[in-house]
């Protein structure tokens, strides 16, 4: 049972009070009474507006539902457009918007590179992600399917030299392409040395050569005659050639190269939202404790692997000698953002005097900013932001009014924490239809603090389906990726960012590669996101970050953005094209395949969320391909099933039968997990199964199609069930 203490007119969970007063506040210069007084003021001022914005969402949705019910058949675009303008769904487009954000770190403003998103409540994942600033290309290639396992190149229990040869060949091809020599190849190199402030490479023939572009050599470790690391720079990203004649790999290399290490995940989003299951004070404090450990540089994780105990901690900065003899260092860790939750959910961690839960997004904003003040004051082992900023990603906002509300919240947080105005920077997730259609107006509301806009295909598709739920049955889920609205949405996001002056000042991001085991496919496809104008894109693992970094060497992002900067196209008409099925004459087999795929993904994710508190995991799909699943993937799958159910493509009985059958499949896929509770043994008593079923059967009733209300309630129900079993 949660215990609370009265703090002013608030009831605050004892666990949070203890954490704030004993861990988070000391060293910030803020007195506890002043802090809690400020929290009370913010909640009193902003909670009513938060509620009003959510009520407006529901009012708009009900109005749109009614319009579609009244206007059946093919949509009259002109009438539809006028209707959306009348109800304020489509806002006036501001003519000129230029962002003026100051004190933005180079990883955001100057460099282009991969971005990781990781659940902050998992210390090991969070540390691995922060440390993924640098990654071994040899390891990434050897352990992934980028290198084929054909012709004796299998990944075996011990090192496979034949596979290793292919890895080294790929890596040295990368060096030749990215850092070409005036003559010869890195494959022919037998020695790297520094002479007269230049990198000199000796080839097998005895000939000495240099880099075609000598400015690419920027530093080294060791001595000039016998360096242990050569540091190179291309397209703003660093690459290390690591040399060690005693290393097993270096020993067999002509030039004694043991590895090639790439600057990889420039930025990491430490997530409190979609990849996290945090439903009570214990969970929220665990989230905040890890964020504090990251900000102070003290976070550690101990785990057992192959029978051995291993420890992870944050990496130190990397020191080098410049060609002119001066020493310098580069960050050893990603620049960290923190993603707060959106405006929807409330939390039992703080209640009002009348017992009402307070908005979780307000609490996240206050506590994560308080914790980040330690970085601003340089209280930690390392510095996250060298420019004195705090980077907060704000998700799931609908239209400019909600973005303006987030801005006011940030203003008030800065006031109570004693921070200069616009210290708190905002990343705006463009993942809701009303934001996509009004993105320029949204940017205008935060033009002095925005550092990031990002498209999110999955959440955005979930909102696309829910908004137009009453319009008719949607196309199959797999066909969404080639739909016209989605292409326009992606192009519109880039155009808005560049028109508003993001180049050289802020990130324009693209979405996640969701198949962490299919790295060769990622290498073939993900470069298109940079060709489309993004200067960062999401990856699911440190390995993926290192491999995706190669795309930023292949594509010069600033030059691409320059060619796209004049795009003044208004994409509204295309974005408003609802992805309705022109014909619903799918075969029974096609319909069942769609149901099976959706049901299996829903159950595979929900069972871990509800019964293990895991908010992000690799979930095998119907074809046993491992997919990174979080609440965004759950939203699209549950809304798609709910849409087909609503329009009679499938029946309620068919949905239930499919879910029951797929529960057995998911049970089999999880058979090796000792913590797993099978669903199919007792479907009525399985909290996870009932949650998954509810997400579909009551999908049309969920606010904007979000899954959080059901997940949170069912997770708390399961926790209470376990507590009773232990008594």
From Swiss-Prot:
It is an enzyme of class 2 (transferase). It is found in: Cytoplasm. Pathway: Carbohydrate metabolism; glyoxylate cycle; (S)-malate from isocitrate: step 2/2. Keywords: Cytoplasm, Glyoxylate bypass, Magnesium, Metal-binding, Oxidation, Transferase, Tricarboxylic acid cycle. One of its GO terms (biological process) is tricarboxylic acid cycle. GO terms for molecular function: magnesium ion binding; malate synthase activity. GO terms for cellular component: cytosol. Its cofactor is Mg(2+). Disulfide bonds: none annotated. It catalyses: glyoxylate + acetyl-CoA + H2O = (S)-malate + CoA + H(+). The active site is at residues 339, 630. The keyword ATP-binding does not apply. It comes from the Bacteria. Pfam families: MS_C, MS_N, MS_TIM-barrel, MSG_insertion. Its EC number is 2.3.3.9. Acetyl-CoA binds at residues 117, 124-125, 275, 312, 540. The modification Cysteine sulfenic acid (-SOH) is found at residue 616. The keyword Magnesium applies. Glyoxylate binds at residues 339, 431, 456-459. InterPro entries: Malate_synth_C_sf (IPR044856), Malate_synth_sf (IPR011076), Malate_synthase_TIM (IPR001465), Malate_synthG (IPR006253), MS_C (IPR048355), MS_N (IPR048356), MS_N_TIM-barrel_dom (IPR046363), MSG_insertion (IPR048357). Gene3D superfamilies: Malate synthase, domain 3, Malate synthase, domain III. Monomer. Involved in the glycolate utilization. Catalyzes the condensation and subsequent hydrolysis of acetyl-coenzyme A (acetyl-CoA) and glyoxylate to form malate and CoA. HAMAP family: Malate_synth_G (MF_00641). Belongs to the malate synthase family. GlcB subfamily. This is Malate synthase G. It comes from Halalkalibacterium halodurans (strain ATCC BAA-125 / DSM 18197 / FERM 7344 / JCM 9153 / C-125) (Bacillus halodurans).
């Amino acid at each position: 049972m949660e215990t609370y203490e009265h703090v002013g007119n608030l009831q605050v969970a004892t666990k949070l009070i203890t954490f704030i007063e004993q861990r988070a506040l000391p060293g910030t210069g803020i007195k506890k009474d002043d802090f809690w007084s400020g929290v009370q003021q913010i909640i009193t001022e902003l909670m009513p507006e938060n509620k009003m914005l959510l009520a407006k969402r529901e009012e708009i949705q009900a109005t749109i539902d009614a319009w579609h019910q009244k206007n059946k058949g093919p949509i009259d675009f002109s009438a539809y457009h006028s209707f959306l303008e009348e109800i304020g769904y489509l806002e006036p487009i501001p003519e000129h918007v230029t962002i003026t954000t100051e004190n933005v770190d180079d990883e955001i403003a100057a460099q282009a590179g991969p971005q990781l998103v990781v659940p902050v409540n998992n210390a090991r994942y969070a540390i691995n992600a922060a440390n993924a600033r640098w990654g071994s290309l040899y390891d990434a290639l050897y352990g992934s399917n980028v290198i084929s396992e054909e012709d004796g190149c299998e990944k075996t229990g011990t090192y496979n030299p034949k596979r290793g040869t292919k890895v080294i060949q790929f890596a040295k091809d990368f060096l030749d392409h990215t850092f070409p020599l005036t003559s010869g190849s890195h494959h022919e190199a037998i020695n790297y040395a520094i002479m007269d402030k230049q990198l000199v490479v000796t080839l097998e023939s005895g000939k000495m050569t240099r880099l075609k572009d000598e400015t690419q050599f920027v530093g080294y470790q060791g001595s000039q005659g016998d360096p242990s690391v050569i540091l190179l720079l291309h397209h703003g990203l660093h690459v290390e050639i690591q040399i060690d004649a005693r290393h097993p790999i270096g020993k067999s290399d002509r030039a004694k190269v043991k590895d090639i290490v790439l600057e990889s995940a420039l930025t990491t989003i430490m997530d409190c939202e979609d990849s996290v299951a945090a439903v009570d004070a214990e969970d929220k404090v665990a989230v905040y404790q890890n964020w504090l450990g990251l900000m102070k540089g003290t976070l550690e994780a101990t785990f057992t692997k192959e029978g051995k105990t291993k420890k992870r901690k944050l990496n130190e900065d990397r020191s080098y000698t410049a060609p002119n003899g001066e020493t310098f260092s580069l960050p050893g860790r990603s620049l960290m953002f923190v993603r707060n939750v959106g405006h929807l959910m409330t939390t039992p961690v703080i209640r009002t005097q009348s017992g009402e839960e307070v908005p979780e997004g307000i609490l996240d904003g206050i506590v994560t900013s308080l914790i980040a003040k330690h970085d601003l004051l340089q209280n930690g082992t390392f510095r996250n932001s060298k420019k004195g900023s705090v980077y907060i990603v704000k998700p799931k906002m609908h239209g400019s009014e909600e973005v303006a509300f987030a801005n006011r919240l940030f203003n008030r947080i800065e006031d109570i924490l004693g921070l200069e105005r616009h210290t708190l920077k905002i990343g705006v997730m463009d993942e809701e239809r009303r934001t996509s259609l009004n993105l320029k107006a949204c940017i205008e509301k935060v033009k002095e603090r925005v550092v990031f806009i990002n498209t999110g295909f999955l959440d955005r598709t979930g909102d696309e389906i829910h908004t137009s739920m009453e319009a008719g049955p949607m196309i199959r889920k797999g066909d969404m990726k080639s739909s016209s609205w989605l292409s326009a949405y992606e192009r519109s996001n880039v155009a808005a960012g560049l028109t508003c002056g993001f180049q050289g000042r802020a990130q324009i991001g693209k979405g996640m590669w969701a198949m962490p085991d299919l790295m060769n496919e990622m290498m073939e496809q993900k470069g298109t996101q940079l060709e489309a104008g993004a200067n960062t894109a999401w990856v699911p693992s440190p390995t993926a970050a290192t491999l995706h970094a190669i795309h930023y060497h292949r594509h010069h992002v600033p030059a691409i953005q320059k060619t796209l900067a004049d795009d003044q196209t208004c994409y509204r008409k295309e974005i408003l094209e609802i992805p309705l099925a022109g014909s619903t004459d799918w075969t029974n087999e096609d319909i069942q395949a769609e149901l099976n795929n959706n049901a299996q993904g829903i159950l595979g994710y929900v069972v871990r969320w509800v019964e293990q508190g895991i908010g992000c995991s690799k979930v095998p799909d119907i074809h046993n391909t491992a997919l990174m699943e979080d609440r965004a993937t759950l939203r699209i799958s549950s809304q798609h099933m709910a849409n087909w159910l609503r329009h009679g493509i499938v029946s309620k009985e068919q949905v239930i039968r499919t879910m029951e059958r797929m529960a057995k499949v998911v049970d089999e896929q999880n058979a090796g997990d000792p913590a797993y509770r099978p669903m199919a043994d007792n479907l009525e008593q399985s909290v996870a199964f009932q949650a998954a079923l509810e997400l579909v059967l009551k999908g049309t009733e969920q606010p904007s199609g979000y899954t959080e209300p059901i997940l949170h309630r069912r997770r708390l129900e399961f926790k209470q069930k376990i507590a009773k079993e232990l008594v």
